[in-house]
Swiss-Prot record:
Anthranilate 2 binds at residue 168. SUPFAM superfamilies: Nucleoside phosphorylase/phosphoribosyltransferase catalytic domain, Nucleoside phosphorylase/phosphoribosyltransferase N-terminal domain. GO terms for biological process: L-tryptophan biosynthetic process. Homodimer. Belongs to the anthranilate phosphoribosyltransferase family. Pathway: Amino-acid biosynthesis; L-tryptophan biosynthesis; L-tryptophan from chorismate: step 2/5. Mg(2+) 1 binds at residues 94, 228. The keyword Iron does not apply. Its EC number is 2.4.2.18. This is Anthranilate phosphoribosyltransferase.
Amino acid sequence: MNIQQALNHITKNIHLTQPQMEEIMRSIMQGEATEAQIGALMMGLRMKGESIDEMTAAARVMREFAIKIDVSDIKHLVDIVGTGGDGQNLFNVSTASSFVIAAAGATIAKHGNRGVSSKSGSSDLLEQAGIHLDLDMQQTERCIREMGVGFLFAPNHHKAMKYAAGPRRELGIRSIFNLLGPLTNPAGVKRFVIGVFSDELCRPIAEVMKQLGAEHVMVVHSKDGLDEISLAAPTTIAELKDGEITEWTLNPEDVGIESQTLNGLVVADATASLKLIKDALSKNKSDIGEKAANMIALNAGAGIYVAGITKTYAQAVVFAQDIIYGGQTLEKMSVLAEFTKTLKQSQAD
């Protein structure tokens, strides 16, 4: 099936089979599809609704083309990532949570990119924090193994995705490619917290991750529209564990945190995001920093739990709070920045 035939199917609201979607995705990754065709596919799938088979097949092909790092032997290896596209422009919760999860004894291999439909993607924020992302594969692996936290800048690992970069940037909408980012971690990670831009995606993404061989995953979307666990509203969760998917709803009060509005947590850019995160992770927090810290604890707790550090999510949230208030997280961030700086200098020499 070629991409024109696929588009014809999609306009009739017909889902593509896994073999059909694999064929289309390969044509994109090999540079055979035009930008107009890729843009039409993005919009068509978005309007039809991406099926489990379409997402699974596209992710499988993208993984096939990825430049990989093999750290799958590491215990408690986890990624916490959002699809983006929620349009809320909050500070970068998942990136802040990564450092808390790493300080808890898990290992983070965080797959991320620059903001496409938000003002602060994980890569934008990390560069503001002085963390170098333009590392080679060996250096990135050293970060993960020696520092317990490493960042996999998507364009370094998914070179073939360059063909979709133009349409993604020009359309500026959430699309199947937002969904594929979290599904295509190139480091062999099998434990994830994945935030999605619609609660209708929670179970389907959990189903996709099951087909892709994941072990323990929480897929989350909050009732106030966030692609993370919210401080201000209940959060819908689809949890894949031991091959079974269960769906549940989380209220902050369930784990001893008082619900609060998100006022003060919206940021203009990566600089403002970093400033708020440093406030939240410091020992002397402002009122807004305190609120951000609670938001981070809810999300870092999910990562600590799926990593297998604690037996329950509630225990993990308490552990995350202890780490945040103990000040270890900021130290983790600054040590990683220094380590990546040293790696870059040795590369230059």
